[in-house]
Amino acid sequence: MTVAVTNIRVEDKLYQNRYVVDAGRPHIRVRPHDWPSVNLYALTSVCPAKCYELNDQGQVEVIADGCMECGTCRVLCEASGDIEWNYPRGGFGVLFKFG
């Protein structure tokens, strides 16, 4: 018996996800800072959705539109107060489709 093997890339699976953006009400906010903490800076590398990036002034910004709500940023930064994280309002956020 032969089993067909299909190679599906992670990016292709993630593309199946859908996002309902709550315009003007992001569920993640980065607290104002002069210089990012080590953990906040780490989010620019470890966020699987790449929601965090450095701006021209060297500060970390978040664009929560593609957030997968995995909680990585909560584990790294919420206790220190670097970010403010809330669940999206009902009907908004990520809709996983593992097609």
From Swiss-Prot:
Q: Which UniProt keywords apply?
A: Electron transport, Iron, Iron-sulfur, Metal-binding, Nitrogen fixation, Transport
Q: By its UniProt entry, which Pfam families does this protein fall under?
A: Fer4_ETF_QO
What biological-process terms (Gene Ontology) are attached?
A: nitrogen fixation
The 4Fe-4S ferredoxin-type domain covers: 58-88
For the keyword Iron, the answer is yes
Top-level taxon in the UniProt lineage: Bacteria
Q: What are the protein's GO molecular function terms?
A: iron ion binding; iron-sulfur cluster binding
The record's annotation in Gene3D superfamilies points to: 3.30.70.20
InterPro entries named in the record:
4Fe4S_Fe-S-bd (IPR017896), 4Fe4S_Fe_S_CS (IPR017900), ETF-QO/FixX_C (IPR007859), Fd_FixX (IPR012206)
Q: Which PROSITE patterns match?
A: 4FE4S_FER_1 (PS00198), 4FE4S_FER_2 (PS51379)
Identify its protein family. Answer: To ferredoxins from P.putida and C.tartarivorum, ferredoxin I from A.vinelandii, ferredoxin II from D.desulfuricans.
* PANTHER family assigned to the protein according to its UniProt record, in alphabetical order: FERREDOXIN-LIKE (PTHR43082), FERREDOXIN-LIKE PROTEIN YDIT (PTHR43082:SF3)
Its job: Could be a 3Fe-4S cluster-containing protein.
Q: What is this protein called?
A: Ferredoxin-like protein
